[in-house]
Amino acid sequence: NDGTELLGYARQVVEQADMLEARYEDGGTPQARLAISAQHYAFSVEAFVNVVERCRDSKFEFIMRETTTSHIIDDVRAFRSDIGILYLDDFNARVLQKAFADARASFHPLFDATVHVFVSERHPLARRPQLSLADLTPYTRYSFEQGTSNSFYYAEEPFSYIPCDRNIRISDRGTLTNLLITSNGYTLSTGVLSNEMQWGMASIPLADAPTMHVGYIMHDERKP
């Protein structure tokens, strides 16, 4: 189920963090440091919390930034973050891979996800076993703003290039969750519902959608 999958995905992120933490400890640094920049994925935050829990008896300085795609790349480029968590698909891969190369960073896959539609459990479409893009046309689309790099290729949601008559852009997951629960809008994501989103939410597969390759980027000068 989604809960089991979430734990599996979180463990993969934690393993990467563990390797980074060990590298700092081997170098004789008395305080472990880990900085992560990520798109707005709840499983990333839950994995980060797991890292904090596992290190609670150690000295550490941890940073978790949920931010735009361009800022993730810039943070990794400038060594402000050890890793950056984001996704690739057939639409954005060429452009983002070039941006990674320009930043001297490489993409490492964590898992593949089928695109899902997130809606309120009271949404008219909530009981459907599968949805199409045509089914979503009458409803408001929610997406995360991308700042000055508001290119379709940098969007956190698949199919961002498809026109929509009603769009709401937000910058935090809390607002997104409130909008989804209280209104008949939707967003597209990996389909992994975190604990904070389990209540009042439905996750429905989207037909004929590209695979989301979720992973992390790391500067080429860093070696886990």
Task: Please name every model-derived segment.
Residues R33-Q39, G84, F118, Y142, ...:
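Short, well-ordered beta-strand segments
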Residues S44-N50, A93, L125, P129-I162:
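Secondary-structure junction motif
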Residues R77-S81, Y87, Q146-A202:
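Hydrophobic hinge/microswitch elements
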Residues N1-D26:
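Alpha-helical "hinge/linker" immediately C-terminal to small N-terminal DNA-binding modules
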Residues V95, D102-H108, A113, G174-K223:
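Beta-alpha-beta core module
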Residues A99-R141:
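Flexible hinge/capping segments at coil-to-helix
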Residues A22, T29-D74, K223:
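N-terminal winged-helix
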Residues G3, V76-R77, L136, T177-T182, ...:
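Hydrophobic residues within well-ordered alpha-helices
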